[in-house]
Design a protein with these regions (language model features):
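Membrane-proximal, proline-rich intrinsically disordered regions
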Residues: 25-79, 86, 105-109, 115-119, ...
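Beta-strand acidic-aromatic groove motif in beta-rich domains, primarily in extracellular
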Residues: 62-70, 148-150, 244-245, 542-545
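Short, compositionally biased low-complexity segments
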Residues: 22-28, 72-83, 148-156, 484, ...
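Structured, solvent-exposed acidic/aromatic patches
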Residues: 42, 76-135, 139-473, 521-523, ...
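C-terminal functional modules
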Residues: 442, 449-453, 468-630
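Bacterial Sec-dependent N-terminal signal peptides
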Residues: 1-34
């Protein structure tokens, strides 16, 4: 008995509309159901592949809206025009709040198909059935991190209920964490043991290339499920520390293991022609000066993968000399020149040289663009030059968000002097995104070890593995996504260097005082959180959650210091949730959900309310910049 998809199309809009969180720029759900003429018999393997395709926690709207907010709230990025006094005010949002629903609809369809199969036939798909669950839990956490309670246990059930369930209840985050832990445990159990019906062992349907993450490898999916439990555990620390530690110990001692190495990492590519998205997200901005300075001071190779080089290669520097224009002071400090016949001639880069001298952040201060000491960072006219017979060109002295780390269709133009050649990198590359990795798992283990968990390795061992793996993982992503200057200098400037990871760099990095696992327990814990903060530079919600629950970066730190640009109590810790319309079938349920969480609904909410009205998992956590309070 297979239901016709057309029936589901009729009710889908009502169901989905009743479960959205976000206030505007909501995802378009109109095309989520397949034309019934294209389906004669549902295919379970296809539905799983479709679920993997619809897995998305790093889409265009996230980078354009939600991620941009959180990255500024946690002082990782600033707008290229500088911060203003309204940076803490919420506006349009998107890319988050209903992402789990996209995959849940397909999981529900699979459950329904299997329900009407012969038990032995249905058992052939047990692995596929449970492989949906790690995806759902991951996206569910992603949605609830900034919006709180959501429909889950009754969501997307309308096509399979009579009367149709059009008003799903909101499950609390506390309930969801328990549900998700149970679902992950079920996944681990099913994937690590034979599937048996009666006394007969049932062979499992092979996904092969239809699973473009792990090729249907049950052991890897079990590791993923086990590793995701750590993401729940760290979010539980301020509500039930003992339970969180117990979960971490169970994960570490589970016979299925955890993500360990490139072959296990949740690095997703959806196809050779899947470029993720093509829209510009340059508005994400530039890195903050304090973060870039920390990375450069410690020669952290990730600075080259996180951010773009600025436009001031040695030929551009020489063009500024030829035009009689001053270089930005912070760039001039790194230039060695000589005077020949009364003219400045570029000689070499000072200090550590290329590529390090090409990375600069912007000051993280309110209205910095209006302050005289920062003219070299924000006054565009200072970066414009022309040479005789050429058109004026602008050269940007700071680094920016590296768009090719999030989208494969991006054309990069190499900075050349006025009148110089036009050199472009226009190759489209299939996009690879990192969602959970060996580094993240080991950073969580290091944290839990310092908090008292009894784990197989020491906190130092986990920490050192994490630092090394994070660098290797970002180097791999940079290579896979072929970001500018990876593997090529474009043969323009003889003083240009590639950004590829070099032998010995990781060992040198781990020897730096700021990266060594040394000091008091509190100092070690801060280092773990700083590494989480850096590792999540391209997972903005995880970065936000880390800062929110740890209070790191913290004020007056000798590592990366929190800048007290405004009172921390005026920085949002959750996102706005729109008030339901009285005609909404879910009006009473949504209103009750807001009330039960203590949330003020609507738009234009005072930032201080978004700070004090916290999602459940955030209650009791330190304020921004205050440091850990365990």
């Amino acid at each position: 008995m297979y239901k016709v998809m057309k029936f589901k199309s009729i009710i889908a809009a009502t169901l989905i509309g009743s479960t959205l969180f976000t206030t505007s720029c909501k995802d378009d759900f109109a095309d989520l159901n397949t034309n019934p003429s294209n389906i004669s018999k549902p295919n379970v393997s296809y539905l799983f592949t479709d679920g993997l395709l619809k897995f998305e926690s790093a889409g265009y709207l996230l980078w354009f809206y939600n991620g941009r907010y959180t990255s500024q709230f946690v002082q990782a990025y600033v707008p290229t025009g500088g911060l203003t006094g309204t940076f803490n005010q919420m506006g349009a949002a998107g890319g988050q709040g209903s992402q789990a629903l996209q995959v849940l609809k397909l999981a529900r369809e699979v459950d329904d198909i299997l329900k009407y199969m012969d038990p032995k036939e249905a058992a052939k798909y047990e692995h596929i059935r449970v492989m949906f669950k790690p995806l759902l839990v991951y996206l569910g956490m992603f949605d609830t991190d900034v919006y709180g309670d959501m429909p889950y246990t009754e969501a997307a059930m309308a096509p399979y209920t009579s009367p149709m369930l059009l008003t799903p209840k909101y499950d609390s985050v506390a309930e969801l964490y328990n549900i998700w832990l149970s679902e992950l445990d079920e996944t681990i159990n099913v994937l690590s043991k034979p599937v048996v019906v009666g006394s007969e062992t049932i062979p499992q349907t092979s996904l092969g290339s239809q699973d473009f993450l792990y090729k249907g490898d049950a052991t890897k999916w079990a590791k993923l499920a086990n590793s995701i439990k750590l993401k729940i555990a760290v979010r539980l620390l301020h509500q039930d520390k003992a339970k969180a530690i117990k979960i971490a110990e169970e994960v570490a001692n589970s016979p299925v293991g955890v993500i360990n190495g490139f072959n296990d990492d949740f690095i997703l590519n959806k196809g050779v022609m899947n470029f993720h998205f093509g829209d510009d997200v340059s508005a994400y901005g530039a890195p903050t000066k304090q973060v870039v300075d920390f990375l450069i001071e410690n020669r952290d190779p990730r600075v080259r993968f996180f951010y773009t080089k600025n436009d001031f290669n040695s030929k551009v520097v020489q063009a500024f000399f030829d035009a009689g224009r001053d270089l930005p002071a912070y760039i001039a400090e790194n230039v060695e020149f000589e005077v020949v016949n009364g003219k400045k001639v570029f000689k070499s880069w000072k200090g550590v040289g290329e590529p390090w001298v090409r990375y600069y952040g912007l000051p993280n201060e309110i209205d910095a663009a209006q302050k005289g000491e920062y003219l070299d960072y924000f006054t565009t006219q200072r970066w414009k030059i022309s040479l005789p017979g050429t058109t004026e060109k602008t050269f940007y002295p700071y680094s920016t968000f590296n768009q090719e780390m999030v989208r494969g269709q991006f054309d990069y133009t190499i900075p050349t002097v006025p009148g110089g050649p036009v050199i472009e990198d226009k190759e489209d590359r299939p996009w690879y995104g990192m969602f959970l990795s060996t580094a993240e798992v080991n950073l969580y283990f290091a944290e839990f070890s310092l908090l008292g968990a009894n784990l197989p390795k020491t906190a130092e061992e986990y920490y050192n593995i994490a630092v090394e793996r994070s660098v290797l993982e970002y180097d791999k992503l940079a290579s896979l996504n072929k970001i500018p200057y990876y593997g090529t200098t474009y043969a323009y400037d003889d003083n240009e260097s590639v950004i590829d990871l070099k032998d010995g760099e990781i060992a040198n990095l781990k020897a730096k005082a700021d990266y060594k696992f040394s000091g008091t327990t509190a100092e070690k814990l801060e280092k773990v959180y700083i590494q989480q903060y850096l590792h999540f530079m391209y997972q903005p919600t995880d970065q936000f959650v880390t800062v929110r629950r740890s209070g790191v970066p913290k004020v007056n730190s000798s590592l990366i210091a929190w800048q007290p640009i405004i009172e921390s109590t005026n920085i949002p810790r959750r996102f706005e949730i729109s008030l339901p319309d009285e005609t909404d079938l879910m009006f009473d349920i949504k209103t009750a959900s807001l009330k039960s969480q203590g949330f003020t609904g609507g738009q234009g909410i005072t930032p201080s309310l978004l700070n004090t009205e916290r999602v459940w998992q955030d209650k009791g956590a330190p304020n921004f910049g205050a440091g850990p309070n365990f």
